[in-house]
From Swiss-Prot:
SUPFAM superfamilies: RING/U-box (SSF57850). Its EC number is 2.3.2.27. The keyword Transcription does not apply. It comes from Schizosaccharomyces pombe (strain 972 / ATCC 24843). E3 ubiquitin-protein ligase which accepts ubiquitin specifically from endoplasmic reticulum-associated E2 ligases, and transfers it to substrates promoting their degradation. Mediates the degradation of a broad range of substrates, including endoplasmic reticulum membrane proteins (ERQC), soluble nuclear proteins and soluble cytoplasmic proteins (CytoQC). Component of the doa10 ubiquitin ligase complex, which is part of the ERAD-C pathway responsible for the rapid degradation of membrane proteins with misfolded cytoplasmic domains. The modification Phosphoserine is found at S253. Pfam families: MARCHF6_C, RINGv. Zn(2+) 1 binds at C8, C11, H35, C38. The lineage of its organism: Eukaryota, Fungi, Dikarya, Ascomycota, Taphrinomycotina. Residues 111-165, 475-495, 600-612, 685-710, 793-806, 983-1002, 1076-1089, 1165-1179 are lumenal. The gene is doa10. Belongs to the DOA10/MARCH6 family. It catalyses: S-ubiquitinyl-[E2 ubiquitin-conjugating enzyme]-L-cysteine + [acceptor protein]-L-lysine = [E2 ubiquitin-conjugating enzyme]-L-cysteine + N(6)-ubiquitinyl-[acceptor protein]-L-lysine. It is a multi-pass membrane protein. This is ERAD-associated E3 ubiquitin-protein ligase doa10.
Amino acid sequence: MNADDEICRVCRCEGAPDSPLFHPCKCTGSIRYVHQECLVEWLGHSKKTHCELCKAKFEFTKVYSESMPRTIPFTILCRKLASTLKQRVIFFTRVLLTFFCWTVLLPLIFKHVWNLNFKIGDTYTIHARNKTFTAPQKPGYFESISQITSSPRLNTLIANTAEGQVLTFVVTFILITAFLVREWVLQNAVQVADELQGQQFENVNQNNQAQAAAAAAQNLREVREARQRLAMVMEHLRERQEQRNLELQRNGSFEEIERARQRFALLGDNIREPQEEENDVDVDEIFNRQQLNQPALDLNDANSSNSVPVEFNSLHSQNVDYRDEVDSLRPQFNVDEQSSISHSSNASENIVDGAVTQANGIESDFTRVDHEPIIVNNDDENGNNESENEEVIEEDNLNRNVIAEAQNQVVADEERNAVARAAQIAEADDADDFDGILEFLGLRGPITGFLQNCLVIAFVVSVFLTTAVGIPYMSGRLMVEWILFIIHRPTFILRFILSFVNILFDWTVGGAFNIVKILTKLPLLSTVFVKLKLQGIFSSSFQQVSNNMYSWIYDHVFSSSDHAYESLIYYMKTGHKQVVQSFSIFPVFRVCQMFAVILKDFVENYSNRPVDRVFTTLIGYCMFTFLGISYLNRKQFLFNDPQIRNVELAFREVLRQCGSIAKFGIIFSIELVVFPIFCGILLSMCLIGTFKKLAAENLLNVMTVYPAQSIFLAWFIGITFMFEFAVFISMVRKIVRPGVLYFLRDPNDPQFHPIREILEKPMLFQLKKIGFSAILYFAFIIGCVGSVIHLLKSTGIIFPIEFTTKPAVFEAPIDLLALEILIFLSIKLFKPLELTRSFWRTLVSTFCRCLRLSSYVMGQRYSDEEGYYPKQYFSFLRRIISKPSDTENQDDGDKQKAKKDFVQDGFFLWCPSKDVVPVRQGAMLIPVTENGYEIFGEKKKVEENADYTITYAPSNFYKRLIALLLFCWICSTLVTVLLVFVPLSLGRAIYAWCFPNVVKHDFYAYAIGFYSISFPMYAIHASVKFLKLDYLRSLMNKLNLKIVMRSLVMALKYLLLAFLGIFILPLLLGAIWELYVAIPFRTIFNRGTLALDAFQNWVIGLFMLRMIYFTVTSNEERFVSRLFQDAFRDRWTNPQILPLLKNVLIPFTSALIAAVVLPSVFTYVTYPFLSSIFPSASKTLMYRLMHPIFLALLGLALLGRRFVETSSKWSQGIRDDLYLVGTRLHNFGESAPPAISESAEK
């Protein structure tokens, strides 16, 4: 087939009368033409409308039926309109139903289930049953919502719906979070288990090294035996090949046979050489070398011109047998097979040329003999068949090209179809996911399925609320009620005990009394009782005797001790008060007394308050947690049935997973919620007195009245402080030597896994760690922050800071605009992060030089720090001033003298050199000699470890470290105070001079003072740097008239752009805001005199211009964004500002001017006519309302245009649905008619 033949690019077939070929794009060659059916099918797979190669858009023309009328009948339009309206009504009704179910019905159900759980817990308890009156419940936390309407029931419904929505959101968030945390925990738990198994495996390997060595020796012996067997097999193969070569000598030349024998001999060398080498040769290397060096039979004679193909099938079959024998040696050593067979066109060309060569370079000729016939040349038939061979070769080449092209086309079609199938499957998955979401929401699918989903969700959430809140609350309520009952009713318990004792006493002593009373009536015993004067006692009943005894004890015992009892009570009360007053000076005692008061208030006022319910629910969770831990610690099963044991095992696994999730949630909540709140409260306490109205009483009142807002503010302050502290620690890590902060975990450590650590470590260890961190943060905040603030407050110079929001200093938000610009310039010019890092690096290195800690802290060892000069009292100043290399440049005499006066002291430390070293108790800082021998203990040499290094440590090492921290803190505190005091004092003076009648505002004062100092300092620094680098002289040498003119033109361009961007455009945008928005609203609500503030409009215009700029330049593919990029690409040499002005700024400015001027001009021209129509409207009112009227008319015009477009599309859709027959593809460059009929197409 010729290259010019027209075939389809997809199906590779020619055109037909019923299926012609088209060239719809710019592509040429074999992919120029395509069938319309193939193209439509491909476009359906790819979801594209243009060619992927030339990006040309495919053009189709719609083909309509012959019976299509010119205009659609009105009845059809009405039916379609009714059908469309019906579908829209059904759809919007369904939307309203789903909206009602999701936002009203389900939240109300959840709210009632929530209230029902608490009502059951409050009803079926002892304390609640004893209540005779229950106060009516308030609407909840949504009191403002519950007062919207005048109907109480409707207000209650609205409040319950709002609370239910919040409850729904919280429950959904908790469920999703619990699911994600569970997956996260299980994933990390699996990794932990795998690592533990790996560690156990390593331990087993370490304990069984002898067995591993024996196994290695056995493998080595097997390798040697395999090597010997391989050599025997290859020797046998060589003998058989020599026999075959004798047969080949009859048909080939001796040189070719000798060449083949030499190649085959290389294999024997490769087999013999490894036997002579060491025993650690890999078996894989032997087999690979065997495959790479197998001989190739090349029986070709350059002088011969005729060749007859001869196939050696017998040779191949025998060699395959021996190859199988060689392969049988391999499986136990896992040797990779590398032999392959190539069938490429290059191999075919080698066959035609008369040579049998390797196609891929790594295959054996023995396995390739049956695929590639060996060509043996014949000199006798040299010139007879030369022309025939050339024809055969040419025909063979054509056939190979056709076959190769067909194979390539098949491969390309398969790849194209695979890509299309993959894209179709991915798109179908996305569509299914989207359809599933819509069906779940109720917008698609059967309505019964949606209602079923709602019922299932309501049931699941109700069960969750009952399980997670109701049952713990009821259980905790019962426990708390019983405890409070015992506390409230101690006399009841005593009465119960006394009644039990009384019954027992009556039963025993009364029975004995009656028996003795009977015995007294006997003749013999009556005389004995008369002599003992006991007959009168037994003459009465037991009840009378016991009552007389009780009255006698009370009269003779308690009456005499009343005075002593009253004295004891009086002294106990007075002593208690004195003890409380004496111990109240201690803060710990006051905290305990505060908690005692809170506990007393809780005990006395326990009811159904929110705080009580939270506490009760926590008590219930604690009880269930205790029961669950007790059950998991039980080593035996509760049941003996195997099936029940399986259920019990599953229940245990669920409890373990819940325990892991609860443990992670508790630790995570403490570290990210409770701990920041704790830090925020401490910082708030430290800031008491810094502001004018910030006192302890006010802070406590605010936290009491607004608890949620106060907790959030404390959390925000605390988390910000912790983040800044973490950034500071990260900066210190970059300054000091690696390994100094080994005791602080590095978050960037790849071996640090906080989640796995939470799962591995016990709960008590985690709580101890958090408590230790809390103590450190408490000490740091109180000691380093609170102490400084307290000292500054005692001076009365800076504090209290005056800050107010009413009245505003500026009517226009110029302060916000200035703050944004100044902060941006400050960050760009001053680079605060680099400046802070440089300050701390200088500070730490300077104090390390003073304290001789440079080797340990900074990793820089200096000889002058390893001792001292006895007669020099201020040697630290000498170390600061002098350079470390000064001692090396001294003369020999000076060095000897310095060495003679220098006294070495201190020692060396074996310390970590990385921050990720595992901490070992008592083995991190080991005193050693310079050579690495321990000073104390066994005095052995420490083991070499890349994670440790030797540094110098002076005498009093730990005291010097404490002094380093103390000096750094003092210097940083002084610098911070100066950065606050100096700008604030200067700013207050400038602010009072500029705004004498305005309320004091220290925020503005500090900003004015800071930038009044910093910008001049930066200008001086930049000027010195500019002069030092000699920029002026180099610039003056390059100046000429052309450069000056170019610079002036560029300056004029920038001035024009700045004038437009800073003055013209902001003023126009501010005027549009004022004329179209502000003035109409003021006119409607206030008909007084209105005045335009140009400054305020300019500020508002600047904000609007910035928003417009960021909106149009957010997408880099837009035309405006590309113009801005091109304009400022070469901003200092050749800025392209004119295209930007021509295409963007001038049209935009003209549109703004027209929007400002045209309504006023129209009002001026049409005022006589308008005044006759609206005689009551004044001229001023018309001018004020004309701009919004123009805006409304423009909006109506846009809506009308949109309505016309929608109507046209709708009628076109009806036409397509009723009369469309098909489409016809157009060739590239043809003008496509709008539509054709079916007869015209034919």
